[in-house]
C-alpha cells in the first residue's frame, strides 16, 4: 500500500536529495584541489551541473574561452563525465580555447602576476598535467589560440554551453561574446565569470542585459558567475 506523503516525509525526501547533491559537490571539489585558479567551488559546481543538464537545453558543444590552468575545465568536463556515466552516451568534449600565455594581469609586474607565466611563458604543460590528474583527458580538446583566432576555425556547430572567462577588459569581453554567442541556439546558455568583480566584464554584461532586443536573460548565478539563457 502506497504511503501518503506528509510534510515530514516530504522534508526527509528533500533533505535526502540535498545531501546527495552535497556529496557530489564535495567529491568534485576535492578532485580538483590540486588545480589553482580563481574559480569559487560554487561557481565550478554550477558549471558542472549545467554541463550535465543535457535534457534541459538544445544539443551542442561545450566551449570555454579562457582555460588558464584547467580549474573551470575540470568542472565542466566532470559534468560531461556524469552524462556518460548516467546514460552511456557520448557526452562530447569541452573545447578549451586559450593561447595559454596568460592575460595582461598575469604577466611580470601585473596585478595577479603568475609564476608559471613569468617562468615558462605558458600554462599549457601544467594545464595538461592537471587535466590528466583529474582523469579527464578524454573529455577535453585543447584549442591553443586566442579566442578571435580560434573562432575562425570553428566548425559552425551549435554551442549549448559557452563560458567566457578570457581577457577581462570590456572590449575583449564584448568581442568574445560577439564572436562566439552566434553559435549559441535559443535555449542555450552563456556564462560570464567575474561579474561585479572586474569592471570591464561587469559593464558589458549590464549593457547586454539592458539591450532592448532581449536576446539573453539572466537565469541564475553563483558568486561572480552569471548564467544567461538565449531566448531569441
Indicate residue ranges for each PLM-predicted region.
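Short helix-coil-helix linker/hinge
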Residues: 40-41
